[in-house]
Amino acid sequence: LSSSSAASDVYKRQVLGRESHSPQLNAILLWTGKGYQGIRHVKRHIQPFGEYLPLRRLVEKISPYAMWAGNFQPGNDDGVIPVDGTRAGVATCFEIIFDDSGRQAVHHAANWLAVPTNNATFGFSNETYQQLAISQFRARELHRWVVVASTSGASAFISPDGTIWDETPLYEQHYAVRSISLYGIRTAATYLQPWLDRIFCTLGILVCIGSIISWKKCKIPL
């Protein structure tokens, strides 16, 4: 009964966001046979127009559909949850597309990655498989096993070489058990990636500026 009561309390507070004065959060909770362990990961990269609405006050005056958008707040944790002596780097749903989601977790000693996701709104489209492909990329980039667990999309284990194991069909109940290896190494990507981002962004800006200058010089008067 105590576990059921705790589950109900956490569900109301963290999932429904109904606790007075508490923000809405998309949170992954660590739950064991002893109940909620008080450890969670709050999604840091929340989805615009779904989990939150940019320029909400303005858009609400324009469209009645604005009320359907969520009002979630992003988290600021390191993305690591301790699980049975391991350290899981958690990226919720499409949070895995952001470079820093896995990199930051690895910097905080994550030795495998978990991607819990819903996918219900994707239907039978290829978005589920796009997310799975991005998870493959992260597995190779960071040299970590990735476990994708979906409520309705494709679940799978992905080894550090990008191989997909035990992939499940869409909208079918399955379970799978597999032993995975834990890694502590850091790849070159974990160190170089932030600098490469800055370099290519700077180059892109310079190319745009150069194109504008060149266009103005070559502009033919009408």
Predicted regions and their residues:
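A short loop-to-beta-strand structural motif that recurs across blades of beta-propeller domains
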Residues: 27-29
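Short, solvent-exposed loop/turn segments at conserved positions within beta-propeller repeat blades
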Residues: 21-24
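Single conserved hydrophobic/aromatic residue that forms the stacking wall/gate
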Residues: 1-11
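Active-site beta-loop-alpha substructure in enzyme catalytic cores
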Residues: 62-136
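Short, acidic, Ser/Thr-enriched surface-loop or helix-capping motifs
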Residues: 31-33, 158-159
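Flexible, solvent-exposed short loops/turns enriched in glycine
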Residues: 46-66, 121
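C-terminal beta-strand edge segments of enzyme domains
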Residues: 53, 138-221
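Generic structural signal for well-ordered beta-strand positions
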Residues: 37-39, 165-166
